Curated annotation (Swiss-Prot):
[4Fe-4S] cluster 2 binds at residues 74, 104, 107, 110. [4Fe-4S] cluster 1 binds at residues 64, 67, 70, 114. The gene is ndhI. The lineage of its organism: Eukaryota, Viridiplantae, Streptophyta, Embryophyta, Tracheophyta. Its cofactor is [4Fe-4S] cluster. GO terms for cellular component: chloroplast thylakoid membrane. It is a peripheral membrane protein. This is NAD(P)H-quinone oxidoreductase subunit I, chloroplastic.
Length: 166
């Protein structure tokens, strides 16, 4: 008779424990009910990136001295620097500079180690294309100034959202 009573007690304890676990899960679900939604409607709303966000690289052609430090510190030897040695002034003259963003890992080493600060990271992250060859940016495409998300009037940022009345 005692084994049946102990089995019944164990069954009751397991039932109470299961109900407690279900209640804990339900309380967590209810605690999320009064939070603001995290999802943004992407093409029309964008998150404002942080100050140190590593997006598309901006290149200033006039500042570059063709030292190729960016190529040496890049883990995948990505930037292509074409230069010509000017014999009369004994300096390098930059002819072409390009980066393939289809291969770039956005580590930021080139920006960090550039001695003339001709490279900088922007907050631009929309680089998707239908053709991978369009991701190979030359010095003209790299020199294009990025439009700030805050200044873009077609985009509603999280800061510009109407307040939700509670």
């Amino acid at each position: 008779m005692f084994p049946m009573v102990t089995e019944f007690m164990n069954y009751g304890q397991q039932t109470v424990r299961a109900a407690r676990y279900i209640g804990q899960g339900f309380m967590i679900t209810l605690s999320h009910a009064n939070r603001l939604p995290v999802t943004i409607q992407y093409p029309y709303e964008k998150l404002i990136t942080s100050e140190r966000f590593r997006g598309r690289i901006h290149f200033e052609f006039d500042k570059c001295i063709a030292c190729e430090v960016c190529v040496r510190v890049c883990p995948i030897d990505l930037p292509v620097v074409d230069w010509k040695l000017e014999t009369d002034i004994r300096k390098k003259r930059l002819l072409n500079y390009s980066i393939d963003f289809g291969v770039c890992i956005f580590c930021g080493n080139c920006v960090e180690y550039c001695p003339t600060n001709c490279l900088s990271m922007t907050e631009e992250y929309e680089l998707s294309t239908y053709d991978r060859h369009e991701l190979n940016y030359n010095q003209i495409a790299l020199g294009r100034l990025p439009m700030s998300i805050i200044d873009d009037y077609t985009i509603r940022t999280i800061l510009n959202l109407p307040e939700i009345k509670t």
